[in-house]
Amino acid sequence: MACKSKDIFSISEKKSKIHFITQITELIIKSSNLMKTLGFETSKIEGIVTIEEENPKLFFEENFDFFNTNFNDLEKDEIKIFIENEDNQLSLGTIFFAKPMNRYLHFIEDRNFFDIIENSSLTAHFQPIIDMQTNKIFAYEALTRGVLANGELMYPDVLFAKSARNDMN
């Protein structure tokens, strides 16, 4: 299977419009009301609630708990986010690149994982496999670890779980 991780997901830090997109009317109303609760003016067109934000990445970092508290997992998967700025205009063609809200929240939650990917800080350890009958090495297995900024290791179970949930496998 081909690797899908050529394009590393990131959240813009430029002044942008953040579009919350869904075909479920109740989620449009809920999204609009919750953005107003946060103090944002919203604009709505059918299926899209829009706010303007100076730094979308900081917006998701600051409101991480708010989104997790006020939206359940099904809602976070249903609501798609599109960040529009001068580099990325919303159109009929680009709207298909909108990602689920969960993807943005995972990006914030899994910051250590993305640091490992961005910095290419993976290490491999080779471990011998011993034949119990002959007590000789008959093969080796490679164990991949991510190296965190503080030097600690992210073990394969965590590394691969974060890779899968961020669609990087």
PLM features per residue range, with description:
Residues C3-N102:
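N-terminal accessory interaction module
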Residues F97-N169:
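Bacterial c-di-GMP phosphodiesterase EAL domain
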